[in-house]
Amino acid sequence: MGMRQIETLVFDYGGVIVNIDDASVVKAMWSLGVTAFKRLIHIRKIKRLMHQYINGLVAEAETLQEMLNLCRKGTSIEDIEKVLEELCGNLPEERLKALVKLRKRYKVYLLSNINDTLWQKSLNQMNQLGYSKDELFDGVFLSYAMRKEKPSIEIYEEITQLTGLNPDTTLYFDDRAENAEAGKNFGFQSVPVKTNHLEEHQEWQEIIKNIV
């Protein structure tokens, strides 16, 4: 894709900045006693609960209790929380180094569907690697705090209003096709990222090749 002028970068978090493996988390739920029959009957429910947990738009305790109801007797909320920690994924330090450099040339924002628990754990991951969110991003916009989620048009409108960014000069990276499409429809130069493979995209390669 041929990029127009770029002044602002907006990144999703899971699958773009941090490498994630949702499938491994679902499999880990099976280890808590979700039987084969329940897997078949409740797979949509489990996926809904995972989505609900990640986005943080429903009370976390309520979501965890629904998950607990699907598990074997004797399973605790703590057992489920331990499994869900895997959603924090693996954070490549090279991407964080690149973000710091990109901020010298662009405004850099994070726009993520994520809950408070996962975000706090993600901040700890950044800190362990020697970075703070303020070093990496000019602003952070999270679904649980905004009380809205991608791909709703309202979340793109709000980040635009709060930052003053120009959608036409904004490059937006997201690994969910529906989010990337919504961003494109809003006016962003949108990149549908292959999950966990940001570096493979020409748009990423172009913006980092000239930074020092």
Predicted regions and their residues:
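A metal-dependent, Asp-based hydrolase signature
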Residues: 50-81
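Substrate-recognition element of Asp-dependent hydrolases with the DxDx(T/V) motif
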Residues: 77-127
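Active-site neighborhood of HAD-like aspartate-dependent phosphohydrolases
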Residues: 2-45, 69-70, 185-186, 199
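Alpha-helical elements of Rossmann-like donor-binding domains used by nucleotide-donor carbohydrate transfer enzymes
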Residues: 24-27, 48, 62, 66, ...
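Asp-based, Mg2+/Mn2+-dependent phosphohydrolase catalytic module
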Residues: 2-6, 115-116, 122-212
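Generic structural signal for small/hydrophobic residues in well-ordered secondary structure
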Residues: 12-15, 56, 110, 140, ...
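Soluble or luminal CAZymes and related metallo-dependent hydrolases
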Residues: 59, 87-94, 151, 155
